[in-house]
Regions:
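Stable alpha-helical elements in mature extracytoplasmic
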Residues: 61-69, 90, 94-98, 176, ...
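An extended, acidic, His-containing surface patch that forms the Zn2+-binding/catalytic region
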Residues: 88, 338-418, 422-438, 444-547
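Gram-negative bacterial Sec-dependent N-terminal signal peptides
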Residues: 1-30
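Acidic-enriched catalytic cores of C-N bond-cleaving enzymes acting on peptides and small amides
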Residues: 238-240, 245-274, 279-333, 337-406, ...
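Acidic/histidine-rich catalytic neighborhood of metal-dependent amide-processing enzymes
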Residues: 173-260, 295, 383-397
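Active-site metal-coordination/substrate-binding segment of hydrolases
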Residues: 128-202, 208, 219, 519-520, ...
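Sec-exported extracytoplasmic/periplasmic mature domains
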Residues: 70-78, 103, 185-189, 355-362, ...
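N-terminal helical capping/dimerization or prosegment-like subdomains
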Residues: 31-146, 416-419, 430, 524, ...
Length: 547
């Protein structure tokens, strides 16, 4: 998710994967490690209670967890403008299912509108109600394009690829909710003495609007120690800031081009260019339309398309007198926009396909051709803002600023472009906004065009230092994976950790494994689902049990 230097993410993942391979890591079926074994293998020793209950949880609740995940995935909990979790039928059904599951598992449940609290009270003789272990998750999801799924994204698919649980929300973040609830149930079953209440917070607008959570936190006392399960292992101590640049390329058509002569020729003309599905997904699909395409130009396009790695193209044409109106469909690879290196951006690759050197003459000036020019000149195929003026920079731990055009859509005003960025520490929002404006001003001067609605937003990066649970979480991860001496990491993603005291992210995704949240093939493997249950059960015990 994050990078240190140009290849930070890939290097870290490669190292993690190498460690997994070197230790012949497999999903442990039964882990009860005596102290002598732990010492001999340099694996941290956890309490016997943590190990026993972790094993019990998997043996007892494997099938029930899959069934519960099936139920939660069935609700399309994406934000709908003008509706709230108390008026949207999908959210109402989702909360009803959470309440029913809480009752079945013997956990308390409280509905606060945008926030649901599910808890397991402390049970030690010295019961301090103000002492809590907070578990932070979210129940809303990003949109899913049904055309790109083998079946409905809201039906848990366990058959098309055995071993995978495929569906929207399986990794981000409904799978984590289910895992936390069954970890709490296993702890309750075994009557583990705890002096901390375990409180699971399920927020219902993490993907769209953090203001209701901020409002809730103004009158709610959160735990003094929190775990967010919405990112990756081993432990996340730094998150980049979610940021964006938006602008609109004005409507320009052949009829109002200054050079009227162009309108009377048969020059090939780029008339439409669009792509992307939502702002925090590297787009898998893009498309363009060109009028007056000659056979020679079509051949050039097809040849260039075949040379692009990771891309697939479909060309549809309607020809009259040897000139064709061409519709190009581009298909890349979706990815979470916090990890643009995991995707193949269909928007930028289609723009590269249509770059001006394709023709002997530049494209006539249209909204589409200007949008393509903006993509090629300000972004290119890179992901680190190398071409966007002076924006590019990096932090030694958090890695570089990343950039991905995510949505290009035609509106009444013109072609609206959304660029999603993830920024590390090292520059102020004011400087970044200034550098973005300067880069866009230079581009506008070059093309003699006035962009509309230029805006930028620069979210705050987070660095969490000295959280008391950090070493315990690292020890749990090391014990169950066999990875020796794991270290905290930074990610490009942005989670609700930023709003809670002493909040660290702990899973559910493994290092060295591509994160599938926000993609059009989101899944979690069954093995990972069960490994997460073991690690969460053990971690909850180690952090809440009476010492």
């Amino acid at each position: 998710m994050s990078q240190s230097g140009i290849q930070h993410a890939r290097v870290r993942r490669a190292l993690s994967l190498a460690l997994l391979t070197a230790s012949s890591w497999v999903m442990p079926q039964c882990i009860v490690a005596p102290a002598t074994t732990a010492a001999q293998t340099n694996v941290p020793l956890l309490s016997q209670n943590a190990l026993n209950v972790a094993d019990y949880a998997v043996a007892k609740y494997d099938a029930a967890m899959v069934q519960s995940l099936t139920q939660l995935v069935s609700f399309n909990t994406q934000a709908v403008e003008g509706q709230t979790p108390d008026t949207n039928p999908a959210f109402m059904g989702f909360k009803s299912s959470l309440k029913q599951l809480s009752q079945e598992l013997g956990l308390d449940y409280a509905d606060h509108g945008y926030v649901v609290l599910i808890g397991l009270d402390a049970n030690s003789a010295v019961n301090n109600e103000s002492k809590k272990l907070g578990i932070v998750t979210h129940g809303d999801v990003q949109p899913a394009n049904p055309a790109l799924w083998a079946q409905s994204p809201y039906l848990l698919d366990t058959q098309s690829e055995p071993g995978k649980l495929i569906g929207r929300g399986t990794e981000d973040d409904k799978g984590a909710i289910v895992t936390a609830m069954y970890a709490m149930k296993a702890i309750k079953d075994k009557h583990i003495k705890r002096d901390r209440r375990i409180e699971l917070l399920v927020y219902l607008a993490e993907e769209s609007d953090w203001e209701p959570l901020k409002t809730f936190l103004a009158s709610y006392t959160p735990a003094d120690m929190n775990i967010t399960i919405d990112a990756e292992y081993p432990v996340v101590t730094a998150e980049k800031g979610w940021s964006k640049i938006t602008f609109t390329v004005p409507n320009i058509t052949i009829s109002n081009i200054e050079a009227k002569a162009e309108a009377s020729t048969q020059a090939p003309t780029l008339t439409a260019f669009s792509g992307g599905y939502f702002a925090s997904q590297v787009p898998q699909q893009a498309e363009a339309e060109i009028e007056a395409v000659s056979p020679a130009l079509l051949t050039k396009l097809q040849t260039r398309a075949a040379a692009q790695q990771g891309m697939k193209y479909r060309f549809e044409n309607h020809c009259v007198d040897k000139l064709c109106n061409l519709h190009i469909f581009a298909d890349g690879k979706a990815a979470h926009s916090s990890t643009p290196e995991d995707g193949v951006n269909a928007v930028t690759h289609l723009a590269a396909l249509l770059s001006p050197e394709l023709n002997d003459e530049p494209w006539p000036k249209t909204s589409a051709s200007l949008t393509v020019a903006a993509m090629n000149e300000l972004v290119g195929l890179g992901i680190y803002a190398e071409q966007f003026g002076d924006l590019a920079y990096k932090d030694d731990f958090m890695g570089p600023l990343t950039l991905a055009p995510t949505v290009v859509v035609q509106t009444q005003k013109g072609t609206e472009v959304t660029i999603n960025l993830r920024r590390p520490v090292g520059k102020t929002p004011e400087l970044l906004a200034q550098q973005a404006r300067e880069a866009l001003a230079l581009w506008q001067d070059k093309h003699q065009v006035q962009l509309a609605d230029i805006e930028s937003y620069w979210g705050e990066p987070m660095v969490m230092k000295d959280a008391p649970q950090q070493q315990t979480l690292l020890d749990v991860f090391a014990h169950f994976t066999g990875i020796v001496n794991p270290k905290p990491v930074a990610i490009g993603g942005s989670t609700n950790s930023k709003l809670f005291p002493n909040a660290l992210s702990f899973g559910p995704a493994m290092p060295g494994v591509e994160y599938t949240g926000h993609t059009e093939k989101e899944f979690i493997t069954h093995k990972q689902f069960m490994l997460n249950l073991k690690m969460y059960t053990a971690a909850f015990i180690e952090l809440s049990a009476v010492k």
